[in-house]
Amino acid sequence: YTSEGEEYAEVKAQDFVTGLKHAADGKSDGLSLLQDSIKGLAAYISGESNDFSTVGVKAVDDYTVEYTLNKPESFWNSKVTTATMLPVNEEFLNSKGKDYGTPTPSSILYNGPYLLKSLTSKSAIEYEKNPNYWDKDNVKIDSIKLTFYDGSDQESLIRSFTQGAYTTARLFPTSSNFESTKK
């Protein structure tokens, strides 16, 4: 779906192949977790091979992705949940060019429970419930706002947290009024 909630295209197995290729071509930081797992990926990333078809990922059909691993990994299922393994629609990627994935709502396609509504650098990120999400009836939170905190004023953070301005906050035991937040 687009940031406006309009259907763009159905997610297909090929989107997962495109996503991994896009991450590899862009030398994504997240590849370090995967490069020794997927057959041929390390060679492609290093430039030893320039043929992505030698990488152990393929779309078997519209709804089946097959990964070939260098060796069995009991924790593989947790690796496929990382951002590097997300689907990328090739047509959308090509239409956005260098703007794909930039921090603006229209530069990203969405297939999860939330749509990005706004992102203000070093300030806030706001999400709204995706009305077209397949399991929307079980998404109980309508909107999410993540507020940036630079760590400079622990006292203010704790005050805001205890007064209900934040539902969660990373609090540090070195703050003078940390004890009051334990309850």
Predicted regions and their residues:
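Gly/Pro-rich hinge or "lid" segments in bacterial periplasmic/extracellular proteins
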Residues: 50-54, 62-63, 69-139, 143
